[in-house]
Amino acid sequence: MGIFLALALGLLGTASGLDYTEPYRPQYHFSPAENWMNDPNGLLYHNGIYHLFFQYNPAGVEWGNMSWGHATSSDLTHWEEHPIALLARGYPNEVTEMFFSGSAVADVNNTSGFGVDGKIPLVAMYTSSYPVSQDLPSGKSITAGQQSQSIAYSLDEGETWTTYDAENPVIYNPPSPYEAEFENFRDPFVFWHADTQKWIAVTTLASLHKLLIWSSDNLKEWSLASEFGPYNSVGGVWECPSLIQLPVKGNKSIKKWVIVLGLNPGGPPGTVGSGTQYFIGDFDGTTFQADPASIYPGNSSANWMDWGPDFYAAASYNGLPNGDVVQIAWMNNWQYGTEIPTSPWRSAMSVPRQLSLQTINGKVTLVQQPQQNWQSVANHQTLQHSWKSVSKGSTKLDSPGKACKIDLSFSDHDSKKSLASTFAIAVRASSDFKQETLIGYNFTSKEVFVDRRNSGDASFDDTFATLYHTSLSAGADKRINLQIFVDWSSVEVFGGQGEVSLTAQIFPKEDATEARLVSTDGVTQNVKLQINGMNSAWH
């Protein structure tokens, strides 16, 4: 019989007395009331509720005692934190099993047999990380440091969970010839594959830059189907995979499969630390075959999902209607994530992003758009401006506050003497603009950028104060279009139709609420600006 981990010690994520107004506290991005958080786990939409589980340390703001925290929402914006779903076994004494990253499904056909009295079981598949050698109730012997794949189930909509101790782990070791990789075998992403009527799970052999694809009839017994990799970027370990299906916009009859994959370290050019890449291809229920255009020679390039430093461990929702795909990522970076100056919590999640495939500049590309429920916290303080020409230099704007949504567009141009070399909006700026975060466009290199070199506190890491950039072409209307989400300690930028994004944390002073436009070396033409203030999702 398993254990009801959610009730252990009565641990609640929500702490009394915290009102989500601490310095740097995100107002419309999820963060736990207190303690350490990293990867999103077990993203599941079921019975009208979005479940967000996450890697969580119940003991403090450092990584450790890995458990699954739990929050729910009806709109992906307003979140309620629940008791810990899967508490590190043995905590607060000697921990014998930690619950590393994984995913969750609603087993609507009760293939697992866990459902009783007509209740649909929710089944989580996760990596059991064992710090000590031990013999398990299932009769399996564990080596210290081993990582294996296990399952747990819930019959009360995710409030309490029972681990499947009779047989866990259900995938004990990596298959031959990879047995030696038992310490780097993790992060199962599980989903129902309708065409073959089977469950599919994708795990990583992290150090070998390989994915293993498994299939099952019942979530309990798994067979190896195929493997994938190494391809493209292999600068660090491969982690946190997803395998998702998306139609190509404009031709609904063409559906492709996409692998989204974390890499740590070895993120996008110009960043240090972790990042997220993707592959587009086909999946037949057994094998993923990447499209030739999705593979680069020499492991020197990749299809980056986000070109900023703070987008990692992107996870996909199971159970969404209409084939929708929404992902949430950890808005942090292993380079400095344990040092960021927040208290009593550490780390936040990205805004939820709706994924699609579109043909951009002749290539099928993964496109991200912010899930539109952010509008539920937009306030009525809207600033709208348009200029035929913004003069060289600085144009001060009314203060948009500490949290806002910005839509900025302007005409592209080639380098001319009278026209700007770069154009940017400065946000979270001090009154003298010595502290500011710049989001803008370089007309010479045709790149969008986020410049956090003067964004605020960067004392905790020598690599933090950096300018990040990536290519962005003008749209068919010859305009550059930017969507910018500003929160108390982050900016997320979506360029064009969403074919590029850059996500970056910032830690400005409390009173840094000013904004301005900066047109360098000349004028910028046909500028349109809309700024919506954002209310707190917590009040």
Regions found by a protein language model. Name each.
Residues 1-17:
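Cleavable N-terminal signal peptides of Sec/SRP-targeted secreted and luminal proteins
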Residues 4, 32-35, 316:
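Short acidic/polar alpha-helix capping motifs at helix-coil junctions
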Residues 17, 250-252, 282-539:
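Beta-rich accessory regions
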Residues 15-187, 192-236, 247-307, 329-387, ...:
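Beta-rich carbohydrate-recognition and catalytic domains
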Residues 244-245, 318:
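Short glycine/serine- and small hydrophobic-enriched flexible loop segments
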Residues 239-241:
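Repeated scaffold domains used in trafficking and secretory/extracellular systems
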